[in-house]
């Protein structure tokens, strides 16, 4: 499942880069966990928010039903809080 998450993240970031969003790629789950457990949003988060494309953020992927088991409650809550604070609406 971790591999599927990383593939989905790479695909989302490829789309984000095509939109002109500058992202420093995270290529392993340790890096993903570090970002989600930290106090800062993932790279490109605010640029994606400005473009109405938070669906391409690491945070949005982390709270998708198929990936939630990969993350601690704290990480999932951090991701959800960041998204909601930025005005993200779930489809």
Predicted regions and their residues:
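Amphipathic alpha-helical binding modules
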Residues: 52-91
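Amphipathic alpha-helical packing elements
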Residues: 3-54
């Amino acid at each position: 499942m971790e591999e599927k998450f990383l593939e989905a993240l790479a695909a989302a970031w490829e789309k984000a880069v095509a939109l002109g969003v500058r992202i420093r790629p995270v290529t392993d789950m340790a890096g993903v966990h570090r970002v989600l457990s930290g106090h800062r949003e993932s790279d490109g988060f605010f640029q994606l928010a400005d473009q109405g494309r938070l669906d391409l953020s690491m945070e949005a992927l982390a709270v998708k039903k198929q990936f939630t088991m990969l993350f601690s409650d704290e990480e999932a809550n951090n991701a959800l809080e960041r998204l909601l604070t930025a005005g993200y609406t779930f489809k």
